[in-house]
């Protein structure tokens, strides 16, 4: 399957878009929760506005900022109070998925909006939308992955909208899983591609098998077919690997995860996640590493959920403040998923040291996100869930992030890495 964007043309070029087994008792309900949370749909429409020009021009020499020469470890730090509040008004941003618009859905507490991440050994500046737009001028930025990729994308669109209005020029697929916005002011395209495994996959459905099918040695061409027209890419996967699945490699069944009734070897999902990331990064290196315009790539690390008990229990994620430093340790599945992603990024960087136009970084947000149990929609994934009184059972989203919310910090770090890369490029000129 090729790109869903294949019929939308561009002026310059076409966009052809076990470890050991984990305990079943601990994760038995997580796939069901995630499946329910990922599918509360948008209305479906096709927008026929043409995609406008984008090229891979270098950043203007008049970029209005001074980048830091030294790198910063953003992974260690603490959340501190910030009287300035959020970077944008959720009610005024039109790109937020309804389930993450917590204030509009009646969330009564506002304290979660007044925190900022403070790294231990360096500074994280407040997001500056004009700087981001200037750095991405004439480029195509793509977010590829599951609904956490979409969550991060929608955060970024809101953060940029105060400086330049994004124009939705394309949408397609169930739940509008493939969309593109155009920023006319800076000739920027920003897209989102639904690809919950990054590799080729067949998702479970009500009419087909009750498990996913992953082909670990084939990248998902729904996004990879567009690779030549992408200048910067943010990859984000993890949660969909918890679902029941059968895995294929070399067209042979490799094993499965939670597949009772099928005559396949249970291998869990840790090694499978590693293979999927390895295949994806190899495809980027092979197709773009020596390409004339190259690519800048990020892997956003695993985002922890914060369920306390059953997903449909009142108070499933009841916290209203961040954890304090030392209150919560990164461990278990959250730590293992992050470690795999970071290790594969480092391995790919080692394999691409001779490629001048391929840059890769882990956007390591797992620890700082773990400290924000207060940042999820919870019951406010639906509008005014207690309008008719409080009930013992209510659906909760303790996976995705409210907008505005902690996920905005991910994009602040994203900008700082882009600034660092630009600084390094200028030194090499």
Swiss-Prot record:
It is a single-pass type II membrane protein. Keywords: Disulfide bond, Glycoprotein, Golgi apparatus, Membrane, Signal-anchor, Transferase, Transmembrane, Transmembrane helix. A motif (GDS motif) lies at residues 145-147. A motif (DXXH motif) lies at residues 397-400. GO terms for biological process: xylan acetylation. It is found in: Golgi apparatus membrane. The active site is at residues 147, 397, 400. Disulfide bonds join 72-122, 93-158, 102-402, 317-398. The chain crosses the membrane at residues 21-41. Residues 42-429 are lumenal. Its EC number is 2.3.1.-. Belongs to the PC-esterase family. TBL subfamily. Xyloglucan acetyltransferase that catalyzes the acetylation of fucosylated Gal residues on xyloglucan side chains. Predominantly catalyze 6-O-monoacetylation of Gal residues in the Fuc-Gal-Xyl trisaccharide side chains of xyloglucan oligomers. This is Xyloglucan O-acetyltransferase 1. It comes from Populus trichocarpa (Western balsam poplar).
């Amino acid at each position: 399957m090729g790109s869903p964007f294949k019929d939308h043309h561009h002026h310059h070029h076409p966009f052809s878009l076990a470890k050991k087994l984990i305990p079943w008792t601990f994760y038995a309900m997580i796939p069901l929760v995630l499946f329910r949370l990922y599918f509360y749909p948008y209305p479906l429409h096709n927008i026929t506005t043409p995609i406008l020009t984008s090229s891979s021009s270098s950043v203007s020499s008049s970029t209005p900022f001074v980048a830091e020469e030294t790198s910063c470890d953003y992974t260690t730090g603490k959340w501190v109070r910030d009287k300035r509040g959020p970077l944008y008004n959720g009610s005024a941003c039109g790109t937020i998925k309804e389930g993450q618009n917590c204030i509009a859905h009646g969330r009564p507490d506002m304290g979660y909006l007044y925190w900022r991440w403070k790294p231990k050994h360096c500074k994280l500046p407040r997001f500056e939308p004009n700087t981001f737009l200037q750095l991405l001028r004439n480029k195509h930025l793509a977010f590829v992955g599951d609904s956490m990729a979409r969550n991060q994308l929608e955060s970024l669109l809101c953060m940029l909208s105060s400086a330049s209005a994004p124009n939705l020029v394309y949408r397609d697929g169930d739940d509008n899983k493939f969309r593109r916005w155009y920023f006319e002011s800076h000739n920027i395209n920003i897209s989102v591609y639904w690809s919950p495994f990054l590799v080729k996959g067949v998702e479970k459905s009500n009419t087909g098998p009750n498990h996913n099918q992953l082909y670990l040695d084939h990248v998902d061409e729904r996004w990879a077919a567009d690779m030549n027209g992408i200048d910067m890419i943010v990859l984000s996967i993890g949660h969909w690997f918890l679902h029941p699945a059968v895995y294929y490699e070399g067209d042979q069944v490799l094993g499965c995860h939670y597949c009772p009734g099928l005559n396949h070897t249970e291998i869990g999902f840790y090694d499978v996640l590693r293979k999927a990331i390895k295949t994806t990064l190899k495809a980027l290196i092979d197709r773009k590493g020596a390409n004339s315009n190259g690519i800048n790539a990020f892997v956003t690390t695993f985002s922890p959920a914060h369920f306390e008990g059953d997903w449909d229990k009142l108070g499933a994620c009841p916290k209203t403040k961040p954890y304090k430093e030392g209150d919560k340790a990164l461990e278990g599945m959250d730590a293992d998923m992050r470690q795999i992603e970071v290790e594969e990024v480092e391995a790919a960087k080692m394999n691409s040291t001779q490629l001048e136009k391929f840059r890769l970084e882990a956007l390591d947000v797992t620890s700082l996100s773990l400290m924000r149990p207060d940042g999820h929609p919870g019951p406010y994934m639906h509008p005014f869930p207690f309008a008719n009184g409080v009930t013992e059972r209510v659906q909760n989203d303790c996976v995705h992030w409210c907008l505005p919310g902690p996920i905005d910090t991910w994009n602040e770090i994203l900008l700082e890495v882009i600034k660092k890369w630009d600084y390094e490029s200028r030194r090499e000129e």
